[in-house]
């Protein structure tokens, strides 16, 4: 009997502690009507915001079927969604984050109110929490919605959120929208979301490049460089893929128009600037193509010099034999006193070989001093010879 009495006393004591620890905002939420509950959530402090946001979301879900399209219930749902603090979400385990995301998806689905939907979308994006179900639901919505009739605010929030949480499927949906006339008024928002997602769609982008024409490759290249300029690895991978495709196009057509040359130079320049030696094989192959294009007057002198000087950045070892061989070829041309070669090209070859300093360039550089080149060229050759490492 005494034992039961002690348990009862302790029970009341613990209950008293619980109620005494409840904040005024929580008590107001429990006692209040919908408007008062919403006011309590909006007045939340650091001590009670987690509890109040959870109570508001749970209450909205539990009573939606009963209260239907009640505006005050929607307002409570919005206040609960917006109140979820970042620190709370950051401290959750993966399973707990999934549970929270599922609750948000439930709110999104059961409430017709656009304000609730927008609040859910913005919060999911801000907290960066999502499940495969949420991504799939958003993908499904954006793939079938009519941009002419859909609520603009909801659509914009959906694009913004998808850009943060989407996947390769999301990118494909948005890329398809970019081609449609009815989506042109959302073009900027659509492209911004695609820009955030394109890294996740690397495989798909490379597949498009590998079968694309010059115009299609140009669009992808420009898009990636514009939207992912700080992601050097991704930009390099796409640039190498584009350069490789331009080589294939040239080899199968035998001619290079201005559009192809421009794309070659731009993609090569990215690899050069990033010193992307992983593309050594591709850039060496491009040098051979550039020689053919230059000698057939398809590539101008300025671009060809850029290729000569840039190849040392992507293929510092492999390029020596290529550059030396080409310089030797020009030297042979000079054996005929009536022949002439491009002095800027010869100077680019000499300077680049000197900068690399590989002793295997000795013979071709020394030969320059024997031919009828200008004093400037001969002086440059002697300077480069002095830089060779033995």
Please annotate each region the language model reported.
Residues 370-376:
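Predominantly the C-terminal beta-signal and adjacent terminal strand-loop region
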Residues 7-16:
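Bacterial N-terminal signal peptides
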Residues 35-49, 69-95, 106-110, 115-130, ...:
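Structural detector for internal amphipathic alpha-helices that build alpha-solenoid repeat scaffolds
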């Amino acid at each position: 009997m005494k034992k039961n009495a002690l348990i009862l006393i302790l029970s009341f004591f613990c209950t008293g502690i619980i109620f005494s620890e409840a904040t005024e905002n929580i008590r107001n939420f429990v006692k209040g009507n919908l408007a008062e509950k919403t006011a309590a959530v909006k007045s939340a402090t650091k001590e009670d915001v987690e509890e109040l946001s959870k109570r508001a979301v749970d209450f909205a879900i539990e009573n939606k079927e009963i209260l239907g399209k009640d505006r005050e219930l929607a307002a409570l749902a919005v206040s609960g969604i917006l109140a979820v603090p970042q620190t709370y979400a950051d401290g959750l385990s993966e399973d707990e984050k999934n549970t929270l995301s599922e609750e948000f998806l439930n709110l999104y689905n059961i409430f017709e109110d656009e304000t609730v939907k927008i609040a859910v979308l913005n919060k999911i994006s801000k907290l960066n929490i999502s499940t495969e179900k949420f991504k799939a639901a958003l993908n499904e919505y954006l793939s079938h919605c009519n941009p002419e009739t859909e609520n603009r605010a909801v659509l914009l929030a959906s694009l913004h959120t998808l850009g943060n949480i989407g996947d390769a499927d999301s990118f494909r949906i948005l890329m398809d929208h970019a081609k449609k006339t009815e989506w042109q008024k959302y073009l900027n928002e659509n492209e911004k979301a695609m820009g955030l997602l394109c890294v996740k769609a690397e495989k798909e982008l490379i597949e498009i490049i590998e079968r694309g024409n010059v115009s299609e490759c140009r669009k992808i290249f420009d898009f990636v460089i514009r939207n992912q300029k700080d992601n050097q690895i991704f930009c390099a991978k796409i640039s190498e893929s584009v350069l490789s495709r331009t080589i294939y196009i040239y080899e199968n057509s035998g001619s290079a128009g201005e559009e192809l040359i421009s794309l070659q130079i731009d993609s090569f320049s990215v690899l050069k600037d990033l010193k992307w030696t992983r593309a050594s094989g591709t850039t060496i192959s491009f040098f051979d193509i550039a020689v053919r294009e230059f000698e057939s007057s398809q590539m101008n002198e300025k671009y060809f010099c850029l290729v000569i000087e840039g190849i040392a950045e992507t293929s510092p070892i492999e390029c020596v034999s290529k550059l030396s061989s080409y310089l030797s070829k020009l030297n042979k041309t000079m054996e005929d006193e009536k022949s002439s070669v491009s002095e800027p090209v010869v100077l680019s070859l000499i300077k680049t070989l000197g900068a690399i300093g590989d002793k295997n360039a000795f013979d071709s550089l020394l030969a320059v001093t024997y031919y009828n080149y200008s004093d400037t060229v001969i002086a440059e050759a002697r300077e480069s010879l002095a830089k060779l490492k033995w």
